[in-house]
């Protein structure tokens, strides 16, 4: 495994593999890796000759009052984890290498990017789309791997790839969860013991959503209100987004029954924002995995 910090060096190393016809898989991350990330790595390893994991805390996707400065960083720890995952390259650039000058060019998918999480984090998904495009340009992967926990992000990247004819296969990978159902996230480290116990309200709310749907709930406004009340019953929890949408377009629905629906939650536990989602009403069972 080799760790590379500059764009030029990574391009040079990958060019030889590309000339030899080797397939390249990219797992973009912001580091502080957990079992969810390693599920992405495992999928990439199974499907590609060469696996690149990028570790870059992207300032473009953080708002003015968000957690850029305190976002957990530990490259030594991450490197040890990735070595066990048989990764070929870690790409760990600095901000000055990725953004040597203030960015004048921004990639935006405005219709998808201003809904749901984008409504409470303006500019976030433009920052995501911009850095992912830049990583695609640098690595030129055949396939790129993203967690389904970030459902909206996957939808945006898929649309971006389609609209811009980027030659990359976008591969969504099922969410990995702790034993109590909480989706793994690098931000879970922010939670105190009490807050971590309270955070289980998020997966419980998804289970409640499935129960309501299976019992025939059809009015999206009442459905969303019921989920807000359910989450708010936990004193540590503040529901910021409780939404039901079309799972492909993310558009609002006028009724729920007779179709699969996306339930999207964005919940603040103390000062920490957690997001989660579930597609309800599809015939196949959930593909989420336990850690």
From Swiss-Prot:
Its EC number is 6.3.2.1. The active site is at 37 (proton donor). Keywords: ATP-binding, Cytoplasm, Ligase, Nucleotide-binding, Pantothenate biosynthesis. It catalyses: (R)-pantoate + beta-alanine + ATP = (R)-pantothenate + AMP + diphosphate + H(+). Beta-alanine binds at residue 61. (R)-pantoate binds at residues 61, 153. It comes from the Bacteria. Homodimer. This is Pantothenate synthetase. It comes from Rhizobium rhizogenes (strain K84 / ATCC BAA-868) (Agrobacterium radiobacter).
């Amino acid at each position: 495994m080799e760790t590379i910090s500059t764009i030029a060096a990574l391009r040079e190393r990958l060019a030889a593999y590309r000339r030899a016809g080797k397939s390249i898989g990219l797992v973009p991350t912001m580091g502080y890796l957990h079992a969810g990330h390693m599920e992405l790595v495992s999928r990439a390893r199974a499907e590609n000759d060469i696996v690149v994991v990028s570790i870059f805390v992207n300032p473009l996707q953080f708002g003015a009052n968000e957690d850029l400065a305190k976002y957990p960083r530990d490259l030594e720890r991450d490197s040890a984890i990735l070595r066990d995952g048989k990764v070929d390259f870690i790409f760990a650039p600095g901000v000055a290498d990725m953004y040597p000058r203030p960015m004048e060019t921004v990639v935006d998918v405005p219709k998808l990017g201003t809904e749901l999480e984008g409504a409470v984090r303006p500019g976030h998904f433009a920052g995501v789309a911009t850095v992912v495009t830049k990583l695609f340009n640098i690595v030129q992967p055949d396939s790129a791997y993203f967690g389904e926990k970030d459902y909206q992000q996957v939808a945006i990247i898929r649309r971006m790839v389609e609209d811009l004819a980027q030659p990359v296969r976008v591969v969504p990978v099922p969410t990995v969860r702790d034993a109590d159902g909480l989706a793994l996230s690098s931000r879970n480290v922010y939670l105190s013991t009490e807050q971590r116990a309270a955070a289980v309200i998020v997966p419980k709310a998804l289970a409640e959503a499935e129960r309501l749907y299976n019992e025939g709930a059809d009015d999206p406004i009442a459905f969303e209100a019921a989920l807000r009340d359910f989450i708010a019953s936990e004193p540590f929890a503040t529901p910021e987004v409780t939404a039901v949408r079309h799972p492909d377009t993310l558009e609002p629905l006028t009724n729920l029954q007779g179709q699969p629906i996306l339930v999207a939650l964005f919940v603040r536990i103390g000062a920490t924002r957690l997001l989660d989602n579930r597609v309800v009403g599809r015939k196949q069972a959930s593909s989420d995995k336990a850690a």
